UniProtKB/Swiss-Prot annotation:
The lineage of its organism: Archaea, Methanobacteriati, Methanobacteriota, Stenosarchaea group, Methanomicrobia. This is Large ribosomal subunit protein eL21. GO terms for molecular function: structural constituent of ribosome. NCBIfam families: PRK04306.1. The gene is rpl21e. Belongs to the eukaryotic ribosomal protein eL21 family.
């Protein structure tokens, strides 16, 4: 049988919550707002499948450059290239200085 090439391949542990984090995520993560130019961390919430960025961006940091509907457009460095990543606020955390 050939290996799958889906978007969620190789994410067995990456998209897994710890025992204490199980269940529905708090509403405050869904209604948080970010401003343009603000730095945010991508922290994927596996209990919310909609608006999930590609798992290869898990743990990376980017700058908010805009908004499309309810989701945010982020500028993230991937190697030497700058990529645009779309994500719902459930999968983002503000960077603390």
């Amino acid at each position: 049988m050939t290996n799958s090439h889906g978007e969620k391949r190789c994410t067995r542990y990456k998209l897994q919550k710890t025992v204490r984090e199980r269940g529905i995520s708090p509403v405050s993560r869904a209604i948080q707002e970010f401003e343009e130019g603000q730095m945010v961390h991508i922290d994927i919430d596996p209990s919310v499948q909609k608006g999930m960025p590609n798992p290869k961006f898990q743990g990376s940091t980017g700058k908010v450059i805009g908004q499309r509907g309810r989701s945010y457009v982020l500028e993230v460095r991937s190697g030497n290239a700058m990529k645009e990543v779309f994500s719902l606020p459930q999968h983002l955390k503000p960077q603390k200085y």
